[in-house]
Amino acid sequence: FVFPVIKKKAGKDTVCDDFIADWRNFVLQNPYFNLNHWLKEMGAENQQAQIFVKESDEIVRKLSLKSSQGGYKIMIIWLPEKMNVECSNKLLKLLEEPPAMTVFLLVSEEPDAILQTIQSRTQRFNIHGIKEPEISKVLQTKYGLQPEDADDIAHRSEGNFLKALETIHLSEENKLFFELFINLMRLSYQRKIREMRQW
């Protein structure tokens, strides 16, 4: 795996292997995530995540090893648009002429942001969104939503399951805040100043 990371220490080259244990746990806990979730997991406060130039050397090194089962070697690069220019340039030759039985999977949220020289060396497959009935069914069975609510959220998610999950979370937050607001209004109506201050 190759994925965007933040610099751990100034002056030290950071590579994905520095975060690989965190990455594996993160992906196993929730397979639906985006860059913001990963940044939060890494503890990146104001740092930008990138795939740094040192990573290109690591990719070359890893692909020079024999495959453990004697078959294909697969390099998955998540968000290749986050590769810095030096890293991209160092990988051009490898992408153009990969070693035998080697496959690169570049998983991108913004394919047009990938360097044109890399785009020209790849074959693009657009993955379409998940159909509304499928999202609705999962929301009902796995998350216990009522059919009407699940259908509404599935429609608003536009085929993006992560967006559907975030909508569920926002709905739960909105319910909580609404209940808190109701309690505050009741205390206000009853003129219970002491309880309002404690609230």
Task: Name these PLM-found stretches.
Residues 64, 89-100:
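Conserved catalytic/switch belt of AAA+ P-loop NTPases
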Residues 61, 93, 120:
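Conserved adenine-binding aromatic site and its adjacent loop/helix in ATP-hydrolyzing domains
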Residues 86-90, 117:
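Generic recognition of short, well-ordered alpha-helical segments
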Residues 69-74, 99-105:
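Loop/turn-to-beta-strand initiation segments
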Residues 82, 97, 113:
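Residues immediately C-terminal
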Residues 1-86:
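Clamp-loader machinery-focused feature within the broader ASCE/P-loop NTPase space
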Residues 100-103, 109-199:
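Charged, glycine-rich active-site and insertion segments that engage polyanionic ligands
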